[in-house]
Amino acid sequence: MVQLNQKFINSIAQEMPPHLSMDDFVHYCGLPLRLSIRVNTLKITSDALRAILEPRGWQFEPVPWCEDGFWVTVPDDCQPGNLTEHYQGLFYIQEASSMMPPCALFMDKEPRQLLLDVASAPGSKTTQLAALMHNQGLIIANEYSASRTKALHANLQRMGVANVAITQFDGRVFGAHLYETLDAIQLDAPCSGEGTVRKDPLSLKNWCPDEIEAIAELQRDLIDSAFQALKPGGVLVYSTCTLNRRENEDVCHFLKERYGDAVVFESLNDLFKGADKALTEEGFLHIWPQIYDSEGFFVARIRKTASVARNTDDPRFVSKFPFVAANRKELSALEEAMLALGVSLPEDAVIVTRDGEFWLMPAPLDGLLTKMRFQRIGIRLAETQKHGIKVRHEAVMALPCNQMLSIEPEAAKQYLMGRDIALDNAGKAQGEKILSLHGAPLGIAKHLGNKLKNSLPRDLCRDNVQN
C-alpha cells in the first residue's frame, strides 16, 4: 500500500467534507488507478471501436461524465498503447478525471469558434476539445515547455486534429496579448498534484504545505490573465488534479472578489448523473478519489458576464508571418494531387505556401497573427517535389478520404513497423494509395504491383506494434 505523507494526511483531514471517510480516502489512494480510454470520434464511433476490441477480451465501463470515455479491462498480454488502433488514433489513453474539463466547457452545447487551452501538453484535453468542436474553429494550444510541445504535436497528428495553432508562452501573457478575444478557455493549472498519488505513489513523498501558497499565487495569476483574455459572455473552465482548497475554491473566489458581478459560477450539477456527490456549494466539482474510484480532481465553470477593465498595457508585437496565400495555379495543382488520393479539402479551406510547402490554416486565425507569435499553425498538406506535389502523412490523417485501400490487421502491423507489404496477386502498379484499417487511415504507401512500398515517416515507425 502507498505510504502517504503524515503531514499531508493531517492537512487533508481538515479539508475533507464530513460525509466522506478518511479511511476510504487512504484505501482508495492505495489502489491502482483504473485504465481508461477516450474514443476519438474524429475517426470512429464508440460503438464501432467496442465492436473491434470486445471480441479480443476488452471490457468497457462507461465514464459517466464523458460520452466517449470508458474504463477498460484488457487481457494480461495486451499493451493498449502499442495497438494498431492506438497508433492510428482511434483512441487516447486518458485518465477519466481529465476528461471532465472539456465536457464541462461544452455542457451547454454552445458553438465555440475561438478557444484557448492554456496548458496543452501532452494533448489529451486538446484532442478532446478538437473532437467536441468537430475539427472546426480554432484551438490555441499553449505549452510553455519546449520539450513537451513535441509530444503535443505528435498526439495532434495521431488523432487527426486540424484546427490547432501551437504557442509556447508563460500562460500569464494571454490577458495582455488577447484581451477579451476568446470565446472559451480551458485552464488546467499547474498544481501540487495531491490527487495523482494513485498514478504516482511517490508524488506526495516531499509534500510541503509551504509550497502550496507559491503554487496558488501562480494559479491566481493564470486565472486572472485567462479571465482578461475571455470575451464577455465567454466561459472559463478552471481545473487541477489536487485536493486542497487554496489551489481550488480559493483561486476561484479570488477571481470573484477581483471582478465582482462579471464573474458567475455556473453549477456543474447537471454535467452527469451523480455529479451531486462531488458538488460544492458554489457548484464546483471537488472530486475525492473514493467518490468515483478515480484520481482526485477539481473543476469549476465560470461565466464572464461583462467587460472588465484592462489591467495590462497592450503589448506591441510585430508579426512576421512566413506564409503567403496560395495562388490559383498552386491551388489547382494541390487540388489535383489531393483528388488523386481521394482526400477532400474543407470548402472554406485557407491554403498558404512556404518554401514549396502547402499548409491548411484554421479559418478563424485572421486578426490573431498581429497579436502574438505562433510556433506552428494548422497542418502541412503537401510539398512540391521534382516530379510533382507529394501529399503529406498528416493530411491524410486529418482530412476526409474516400479512396482508401483496406488492408488486414497483420498487414497494418507490418506497415506501422515501417515494412513493405507483399501483395499475393501481382498486378499493374497503381501509384500512391492511402491504406486503411477499420475504415480509418493508416498512412500512404506506393502500390508497385507486387508490393506496397511503405511511405510512413520514419519517426512514426514502431518496433512493438500489437494487434
From Swiss-Prot:
Catalytic activity annotation: cytidine(1407) in 16S rRNA + S-adenosyl-L-methionine = 5-methylcytidine(1407) in 16S rRNA + S-adenosyl-L-homocysteine + H(+)
Biological processes per GO annotation: rRNA base methylation
Keywords linked to the UniProt accession: Cytoplasm, Methyltransferase, RNA-binding, rRNA processing, S-adenosyl-L-methionine, Transferase
Residues at which S-adenosyl-L-methionine binds: A119, S120, A121, P122, G123, S124, K125, E143, D170, D188
One function term, GO molecular function aspect: RNA binding
Catalytic EC class: transferase
Main location: cytoplasm
EC number: 2.1.1.178
Alphabetical list of CDD domains matching this protein: AdoMet_MTases
Family in the record: Belongs to the class I-like SAM-binding methyltransferase superfamily. RsmB/NOP family.
Stored PANTHER family: 28S RRNA (CYTOSINE(4447)-C(5))-METHYLTRANSFERASE-RELATED (PTHR22807:SF30), NOP2 YEAST -RELATED NOL1/NOP2/FMU SUN DOMAIN-CONTAINING (PTHR22807)
Role this protein plays: Specifically methylates the cytosine at position 1407 (m5C1407) of 16S rRNA.
Protein's recorded name: Ribosomal RNA small subunit methyltransferase F
Organism: Shewanella amazonensis (strain ATCC BAA-1098 / SB2B)
